[in-house]
Amino acid sequence: MPTLKDIRVRIKGIKSTQQVTKAMKMVAAAKLRRAQERAIMARPYAGKLKEMLGSLSAKVDTSLNPLLSSRQDVKKVLVILIAADRGLCGAFNTNIIKLAQKVVTEDYAAQYKNGGVSMICAGSRGFDFFRKRGFSIVKGYPSVFQNLDFSVAKEIAETASGMYLRGEADKVIVVYNEFKSVLAPVLKAEDLLPIAAENAGKDNSGDYIYEPSPAVIIDELVPKHLSTQVWRMMLESNAAEQAARMTAMDSATENAKELLRTLNISYNRARQAAITKELSEIVAGADALKN
């Protein structure tokens, strides 16, 4: 049975931890507001660019741009994983890494067995996990979310498109967390390349005049589209991470509060038992002296 001193030490330690988790919750909440704003602001531009590309791709021969042309025989797959740099965010990293593992080892099991699956990992947690297990990592971006910048998204998009054009990848998939709400991020495995015309835009029926020509414009739009999509996914993942961390720290703070309540009850009971024992010993001693 723990002594009064043991219980006091535990109470002190839990109070200290509770202060840390409460502070981390407040920091995550502040970061979430900023991250959520950036993710929401990126959606209209990315969506409109996707719509324009869909309209154009419906009017040109997809063979004019190889990034629009799908390949019948998919032998090589590039998986872009967007995870977090840090932990203490609940099951955020665990869930996204599990999905990436499923995509690599199950969805494309044949390509994986033949060494045809490679990865680009953004975020320290995903990069460290797959590097230690011997997966083929083309590029890694640890600590990318410490100073999130569009240039990284552009570099990832250029690497992916370059590999596709050189035949080093027949399909490019991005695995990330899409931010829907604080309590409900959505795990997604989304095709980035090839750009499918039917998925590129919802409304391709508009009557537009293109200058100089759809083919020239599409060559300009495709790189912008890829960079913008990767950037949007990184912003979505960052917002989902902050939401997960805020929720996890809130839960930890509440758990600490409940544990403190239980320990205080145990401490008071132990203290009361010790006082009762001392009083009983005093009374017994007094009775012995009388006799």
Swiss-Prot record:
GO terms for cellular component: plasma membrane; proton-transporting ATP synthase complex. One of its GO terms (biological process) is proton motive force-driven plasma membrane ATP synthesis. It is found in: Cell inner membrane. Produces ATP from ADP in the presence of a proton gradient across the membrane. The gamma chain is believed to be important in regulating ATPase activity and the flow of protons through the CF(0) complex. The gene is atpG. F-type ATPases have 2 components, CF(1) - the catalytic core - and CF(0) - the membrane proton channel. CF(1) has five subunits: alpha(3), beta(3), gamma(1), delta(1), epsilon(1). CF(0) has three main subunits: a, b and c. Keywords: ATP synthesis, Cell inner membrane, Cell membrane, CF(1), Hydrogen ion transport, Ion transport, Membrane, Transport. Disulfide bonds: none annotated. One of its GO terms (molecular function) is proton-transporting ATP synthase activity, rotational mechanism. This is ATP synthase gamma chain. Its main location: membrane. It comes from the Bacteria. Belongs to the ATPase gamma chain family. The keyword Cell inner membrane applies. PROSITE patterns: ATPASE_GAMMA. Pfam families: ATP-synt. It comes from Chlorobium limicola (strain DSM 245 / NBRC 103803 / 6330). InterPro entries: ATP_synth_F1_ATPase_gsu (IPR035968), ATP_synth_F1_gsu (IPR000131), ATP_synth_F1_gsu_CS (IPR023632). It is a peripheral membrane protein.
